[in-house]
A protein has these predicted regions:
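Active-site metal-coordination segments of metallo-dependent hydrolases
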Residues: 18-27, 108-111, 115, 160-161
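Active-site-proximal alpha-helix that buttresses catalytic centers in soluble enzyme cores
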Residues: 2-75
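Domain-level recognition of soluble alpha/beta enzyme cores
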Residues: 156-180
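Phosphate-handling substructures
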Residues: 66-123, 182-183
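Short active-site segment of divalent metal-dependent hydrolases/proteases
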Residues: 12, 145-146
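Short aromatic-enriched loop/helix-cap "lid" or pocket-rim segments at secondary-structure transitions
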Residues: 16-19, 61, 84-88, 193
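Short, solvent-exposed aromatic-acidic interface loops
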Residues: 182-193
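Generic beta-sheet signal
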Residues: 4, 47, 133-144
Length: 193
């Protein structure tokens, strides 16, 4: 069985309503440095690292990549939840609306038509379960993707079952088939960016 250290990205330079793929702001870069130190302390030797393809996750992974002299593997299955629109303001309004509901409600939401959210949630979990089945790994991901993993591990059904802070680390365990939550990451009142 492997442990999965799932990290929410650092504070982004812009929110969902301002930029489709922002990097980190100054605080986010500091958070990324701190979480790299934290992970290097927790893990006695380098392990495989995976990152969402989005810039804020790739930049969060960079300090650990430098420290471990490795490169995180881009894993599209741990990217942020897809939205039914590319319009930045409309997608932010959509996200805020669906965040207060359940995964069941999201799957049947008429304004979210065309996206298979059950499949997306399953893809996130499958990536974690298979990549972490026999080895410890680090995964840099997103707020809602972390919630997808949390819900799979705990049986919760809310889209937002917990509020992972920027650069918080949640630890899961994979037996190759399911996820088990070992440690929930730090929560904060945080803006989804």
């Amino acid at each position: 069985m492997g442990k999965i250290y799932m990290v929410r990205h650092g504070k982004a330079a812009a929110g969902w309503d301002q930029d489709a793929d922002p990097g980190l702001d100054v605080m986010g870069h500091s958070q990324a440095e701190a979480v790299a130190q934290n992970l290097a302390t927790r893990l006695t030797s380098p392990v495989a690292a995976y990152t969402s393809p989005l810039l804020r996750c790739r930049e969060t992974a960079m300090p650990l990549e430098i420290m471990w002299q490795t490169q995180a593997i881009v894993e599209p299955r741990v990217a942020e939840i897809p939205s039914p629109t590319q319009d930045l303001v409309a997608r932010t309004e959509w996200l805020r609306r669906v965040m207060v509901g359940s995964w069941t409600e999201l799957s049947s939401d008429p304004k979210s038509a065309g996206i298979d959210f059950e499949r997306w949630q399953s893809d996130v979990v499958t990536a974690l379960v298979t990549l972490g089945a026999s080895q410890d790994i680090v995964v840099f991901s997103h707020f809602i993707a972390l919630n997808a993993a949390f819900c799979a591990a705990t049986g919760a059904n809310q889209v937002v079952a917990f509020r992972p802070d920027n650069c918080s680390v949640s630890v899961f365990e994979s037996n190759g088939e399911t996820l088990k939550l070992l440690k929930q990451g730090h929560e904060a009142k945080t803006q989804v960016n």
